[in-house]
Amino acid sequence: MSHLLFAYYLCNDIRSFQNLLKQDDSKVKEPRKGFSEKSGQKLRINQKDRYGRTVLHIAVSENKNSFVRSLLQHKGIDVFVQDEESGYTALHRAIYVGNLEAASLLLSKDPSFRSLRIKDKEGLSPFQFLSRVLSSTIHPVLDLPIIGNELYGFGTNVNNTLGIANGKEPSSPERVFLLKNQTESPTSGQLFSRDKILDVQASKFHSVVLTDEPSQNVYVCGIGAGGRIGFNTDVQYNFIPIPGIIHKVIQISVSHTHSLALTKFGSIYSWGKNGSGELGLSNDELKKDDPIQITPRRISAFKDYQIIGMAAGKSYSVAWTDTDIYSWGLNNGQLGISDHISVVSTPRRVAGLLSPVIHAVCTTRATICLLQNNSIIAFCNYNQVKLPFNVDFGSSLKVTKHPLSLTRFNVRKLLASENKLAVLTELGEVYEFDMKLLLDRDSTSSKNSTRTSFKFTPLWIFESSDLAALDIAWTADNSLILCTRNGTCWKRELRSKKREKSSSSPYSRGPYKYNRIENLQMVVGVRASASGSFFAIRNDYLPPPIYKPSNMLIDLLRSLLPYDHLLHVRQPRLIPPEDEDGVPIFDEDRAASSNEMQLLFEGSIPILTSYENYKQSFSDVTIYCGTSMFHSHKFILCARSSFLRKLLLQKKKSSVSNIIYIEEITQSHSTIRVEDIPPLAVAILLHYLYTDTLLSPWHLDSRFSPLKENLSKLANLLELPHLAEVLPFSVSRQPLLSLTNDILQLYNNFYVLCEETMDTVIKLKDGELKAHGLFLSLRSEYFSSYFQFVSMESNSFDIPITVNLSHLTVEHMSIVLRHVYSDLKVELFDDLKESDFHNWLETMFEILSIADELLFLELKSIAQQSLLRFLNLKTLPTLMDLSLSYHAEELYSRCIDYACHNIEFFLEANRISEWDGFHLKKVAQRLTELLSDQRVHLPSSKIANRLLIRDPVLMEKRNYELKVLREYLFSQESSQLWDDSPYRSIFEDRRCSTSAVILESGIVPSSNQSDSLNKEDAEEKSPKPNVVNVTSITKTAGASVEIQNNIESASSGGDKTQLNGPGADQPVTATITFDKTSPWRNRENLSHNNNTTRASLRELLEQEKADASTTTVLSDSRFMKAPTKKSQREKKKELSKQVPISKTNVGHIDIELGKSNHSNPWSVATHQRGSFSSSTGVKKSFNGILREAAREEGSSQVIYQESKKRISNGSPTSWNLLTKPSPRSASLPKNSQPLSISEIMTEQKEEIESQKRRSSFRKTIEEIQQEEEFQKWWEEESLRVQKELGILKTERDTSTNRKQGQASKQPQRRHRKEKDSKVSESTAEFKSLPIDIPRTTHKKGKARAVK
């Protein structure tokens, strides 16, 4: 019944599919077997097709998740089954095509997440498989050094070295936060800003973190005894900055008792215990009775040196410049100084190095330096020893030194523990060196013995570039931790089981194994302490910022000028942000172009004439100058000029220097008159007040030169310092920008300075706020439309306009108004006084909702960008839900992109099951887009569309193929489809391989193929009885609809036989050698053999005539005929023509011994009465010496041919063997004995009895007539369909077979010639016509299902 699952799936019949599973599910007793008994049939839900795929594999790959859910609800489903081609599980396939919903369902079925550890045939788990596919899309190769933005800690936390607040030891990696310098009321920007981590150093008692901040960028935690943490504290649980270092630190190094810090100016600061002079400070700088430096102190010995690196040992320290290296502290022979001085209190230069030092590590008894020339020098035993990089190539088969790896052993990093030295190469390989060989070596040993004894052993040799090591770290017990280029983290551990120690893994050797650390991805650096504390620096993916070319406040105010249409629209220039959290800035050239100057000042001077008959709706100030009149806004004049603010707010008439006169002051309008100043100067002044830009017409025409002096007079009078500074220059210069700052400063103090200028009152839930309708309308389309509606209802603005927004609060609306009066971006929300992230998040989305409601589009983008800064693995689900609810499309899109880049994390513990279905669908769509470029070989809609445009017939062919396959799967014959799979697990199945034949005498064959590809089928398959059969070719899903032929070994000359005569002492093994089974190759073999063995063909036709008498043929016969008997001489003659068979060769064709092989899906069981097949021919079994074995089978199989259509009646006789075998045919041994007379007589007697038994199964006349009628209809319908599809170009005469039947009554010679011509014609046309498989047979003119 397994074929019905595939049939319902191909028909997309989900109801029938589910019903079949439910009927079977109630009877399943053993869930792991995956089948049930019903009417003698088995539903094997984990059954594979010919291509080694289960229904679950196919449904997952084709994104048919309704079928996946139904399959996973079945008790017998096995989600760990791997396909036979690549070893992919269903989870592999789901991840490969981006089907996250199916992946979530599969992980839900696997609570232990065992499927995440199953590897395919390339040794890749699902995550490694995904990482390799997306290596260039999601995980690009990063350049070093890398700045991480997240720090994770795990392992032991005995001395509070992990920086976790509660002091617990986390079982899995846990996020570590740095507490920055904060005031009593920190802002949200200070609390929730993202860290930028450069380095982490850990010792047994304390840990130090280095960030990228400009100052105070060193954070410490741990045990403070001895001054090791830089301030007077016994225990510090969290990472806090160290005070006392005013410059930015670029490198840190720690030991058990002291710490070192290197600033960007080359100075070294040290603090901690100075018991052996390891701090590098002179004796007079420390107290003799208490040699402890609590706070960081600069080493004065290096004040004239530019230090580029340093390292701290247990009781000493080293530092180096670009030319020399210096050491100080306790001298045990590791300082590189030949003098036997016990303590070196101040830095001392080490001599003898031929190349500058670029890296160094310290242990208790040795100092190892990496030189610029890639040499490794060790200071130990008061000597300098060079360690040649001699790799032990015999320790692993993976380590080979090929000619193309000239830079393979370039050292990138050194790492040392007490007894081990690890070397990380530029290629990403890790090697180990045993330090005991170096430390126990006598200083008088010869150099030659040193070179031969030192060997580096490989620890990590990768098989793909994405597994190259990026960073490594040691612990005291030699536990190695490393991270790779694909962002995964691995830890080397001692094997716990003996069987594991003897096993071999791609990434482990000897007693150690590498385990992947869960819940860690995108790791760029690892650190470890001697006590077993581990740190992982993670560089999380940062989505692209949300920015738009927004309108600056200057642009909005410039639009109020009447001649704004004459100014060209400048294309903004994108300035990249200063840091990764910043937003790109759109800048533009503020100076007016020469063309604009000509448009404004030439002819009738449009800058003046444009003010005629122009009045802005919110203008409340009128300026008269001569005959010209200018309209302006009181709030802008007050914000730009403190002098005008005093005049306009004093509410009385006044004059200044006989130039400016205040004539009228009311709440709604004011009038200003300017004397002795040309109107053009006033126009230029207003342009500056509104745009911060100075127009210089005097550079265009000299007649405008007096304007410069008048403009300078107004600038000094109105207290405009920035404008007055640039006017004296002869060259055109623009004043400093001050418009935005002036307006924001006035808004922050508007209740004191300019409350009277407010013309809008906003009624809120807990109070009211005043604002300017001008700015509200410039920022929001909502307020612009509202004020326009109010102006249509009332012709004057004498009273303040009231806006009712009672559902909003004053706190939230104040933030909105702050945006209205400024150009602040994400800084707008950094001043929120929220100490809790969830409260801050709620406030942010409330503002986002207000911006969306009131159409503050720019504020909406800024709020989304501010929220995007705090997107991480923990906040992603919340941000996705809220952004979708508040219509934050840009933020939601970035969340989806972030989820795709961290999909491994969310899949690892099936965290995607917590997502909403809509989110899961969107993430899957985005992931599919990212995967589309990486898996171009898979079918996609784009590729399919291009193929259909080029060849439209492909769709018809595909539909035809699926139709034929469905028809076939619903037939009873299809139950044998799966036995012919090329991926069958057991040896007796029809898989092309080299095998030996099991004979009746009990000889067991030997096989060189022991792999089991389908364990379930191997367990359920019963042993085969002793019968010889030939491999048949079947048609399966995915193959093209062409003629599928089952070629007997007679057609290719092959045979397998056995001689068991009375005088035979040993059985003879028949051997056949064939190529791999292929339907196309078998066609070639058939054509070849028919053309090269003419005599055999005639004998074949002669035997066919004899067989026709015992076979019911619908086209020309309605009764049974007795078989033609052969004499003993004829049989001996045929036997003598056979070529001897080799006893030792092993055949290359699969043979089943026992009952008839019904694995051919196109064959029909012949023992059933009335069984009908749509084939065009009858498959023949062996005769001659193989007839004995074939007779025991008692049945035959049907093969398709195009010449005739027949019905199998179970006759054991079939085509004769070819008398002239092909070069591939089997042969009998030359000394084989002929059959005896008694055997021949027994054979003939059995043939007669067999024919009598078969003659009893005669069909009635009614059944024969029905089959003839249906056959005629089927031939006509098949020819018509073939002609429509263009497969058959010429119409065939359907009555040919009938005429051939009548021609059989002609003389024997004529009959033989016609048969020869017809067989050759049928062979030539054998490859052109497809096979049409009928769904039904006729009964009284109607169709019925095939049984």
Swiss-Prot record:
Pfam families for the chain: Ank_2 (PF12796), BTB (PF00651), RCC1 (PF00415)
GO biological process: protein ubiquitination
Pathway(s) served: Protein modification; protein ubiquitination
Swiss-Prot/TrEMBL RCC1 repeat ranges: 148-198, 215-264, 265-322, 324-372
Region of interest called Disordered, as start-end residue ranges on this chain: 1006-1029, 1104-1139, 1193-1237, 1286-1347
Alphabetized GO MF terms: ubiquitin-like ligase-substrate adaptor activity
UniProt-listed InterPro entries: Ankyrin_rpt, Ankyrin_rpt-contain_sf, BTB/POZ_dom, RCC1/BLIP-II, Reg_chr_condens, Signaling_Regulatory_Domain, SKP1/BTB/POZ_sf
Residue ranges, compositional bias (Basic and acidic residues): 1013-1023
PROSITE patterns membership: ANK_REP_REGION, ANK_REPEAT, BTB, RCC1_3
Gene3D superfamilies to which the protein is assigned, alphabetical: Ankyrin repeat-containing domain (1.25.40.20), Potassium Channel Kv1.1, Chain A (3.30.710.10), Regulator of chromosome condensation 1/beta-lactamase-inhibitor protein II (2.130.10.30)
Bias type Polar residues, positions: 1208-1237, 1297-1306
Domain of life the protein comes from: Eukaryota
Residue spans of biased composition, Basic residues class: 1336-1347
Complex and partners: Interacts with cul3.
Function: Probable substrate-specific adapter of an E3 ubiquitin-protein ligase complex which mediates the ubiquitination and subsequent proteasomal degradation of target proteins.
PANTHER family: BTK-BINDING PROTEIN-RELATED, INHIBITOR OF BRUTON TYROSINE KINASE
Protein name according to UniProt: BTB/POZ domain-containing protein 1
Organism the protein comes from: Schizosaccharomyces pombe (strain 972 / ATCC 24843)
Gene: btb1
